[in-house]
Amino acid sequence: YRGLAREAIRSATDPQSPDFLNFHEGGQPLVDCGFLAQALLRAPSELWHKLEGQTQRNLAAALISSRVISPPFNNWLMFAATVETALAIAGERWDAMRIDYAIRQHQQWYLGDGVYGDGPRFHWDYYNSFVMQPMLLDVLRNIGAHSANWEKLLPDTMARAKRYAAIEERLISPEGTFPAVGRSITYRCGAFHLLAQMALLGELPAPLTAAGVRSALTAVMRRMLEAPGTFDPNGWLAIGYCGHQPHLGESYISTGSLYLCSTVLLPLGLPPANAFWSGATQDWTARRMWRGEDGAADHAI
């Protein structure tokens, strides 16, 4: 799979390839570049250092070309910041202003109790997990040391992420469902991007356990991905939340978009001996609570 990923990057960034992707026309390519850049931050050894020199140059040029896209005043700022962070880690010329602007705005948009506004206002959706908090963490963890003003933000950013991860775990019902609220719910279990990331980083908030989170996320994946109609006859994901529900699609949703659900698989980066994989199956918060078990009260931060 690692080899296939590198081959995909080679084909997608080679201007002479029939598979060359659009990195700068329209607005949506900035989103695609942001997630590609985030992959580079998470697996630089496999997805950057093992690329051939020409592919590295093509990839850098492709990411740089996305700078012509002006991001809206919302979560999209993190796509631009993530692209610049990946360029910095790759040893390319990078734009510190794009990173600083995104970080500063998200500090201003923090609303309390682990939640950021998607822009100045609160939106009841999962974009704190789809985009904002995972990218903010990855940017600060990778590039924060370049600026004391950035580095000092990481502890609070991590504390907020832990709180949001705790809320996410509580949203998972005993049956493995979660509220279908807000836009982009066709990203399915990608709604738990942040919870999966915190498991990968070993930063799950107390009293959550790694095995309990694994059990909860497994229940969600089974409930969503085993639903009839989830995949089309060719094996590709179909637009929907639980099955094929095309009216849930939006103008920016394509077949490729749906694979944001794969972020729930981030703990695959943990070794088999890690407690996330080796621990016995455990009930998660809602399952324990609805069974009548006693437990600690939940509190804001």
Task: Name every feature range the model reports, one short phrase each.
Residues 6-158, 170-193, 202:
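Aromatic-lined, polymer-binding surfaces characteristic
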Residues 99-102, 202-205, 278-288:
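Short secondary-structure transition/capping segments
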Residues 122-239, 246-273:
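Long, repeat-rich segments with strong aromatic
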Residues 191, 244, 284-288:
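Short amphipathic alpha-helical patches
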Residues 266-301:
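Extended hydrophobic packing segments that form well-structured cores
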